[in-house]
Amino acid sequence: VLKNVSFGVRSGMIFGIAGVQGNGQVELIDLMTRKRAVREGDIRLNGTSIKKLSIQDIRKMQFGYVPEDRIEQGIAGQESIAENMVSNRYATSEFCRGGLLDYKKIEEFADENIQEYEIRCSGNKQKVGMLSGGNMQKVVVARECSHDPQVLIAEQPTRGVDVGAAHIIHKKIMELRNEGCAVLLVSADLSEALKLSDVIAVMYEGEIVAYFDNTEGLNEEKLGLYMLGLERHSEEQIRRARG
């Protein structure tokens, strides 16, 4: 259960939510991605309430989402890399003309991303389910980041991937931030949260117990104390940090 969770993510910012798994992060993202209904409070994107919109409507607002479970929620394993790359944009004019898919454009787009993200595969027609976990994740990240999102939610984006894949994913997230995207990063990886985040909020037992508007001087040991519930900020400290 979430308890009075309130924060804002600005354009050109990576807002990190750190916490041991099972402390409300999944519930929070489920609300933001419309997997759960919002019964109290509100969620706004560029000032517009999205709590009654479908995920399809939200995606039209240049919204990207890298889910925690890439196999169950991020890919269609029996479909090709090319098909997975455009699964969130099949009906757009970029890849569809007169009601027909432009397979040449789709494959060119997939090939560009395969090269940019260094996806190890036999070609764009290979089934995504045949890839390694790290390469599956790069397909998901490429799809969600390649349409210039205004907002990106990245949920445990490098879990279970090798160092090389993690480096590529981190680089892309930071590039999006530098281009003005508002990034919400949810991570249980202390080093990842500290490396990428401009601001960090710590969740424990469904509430924000610490809010760092400046991560300079913050280290893994200190952050870990808040994640374990051993320390917490006062309500006044959180209010001041949020501005």
Which role fits each region the language model picked out?
Residues 1-243:
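Glycine-rich phosphate-binding loops of nucleotide-dependent enzymes
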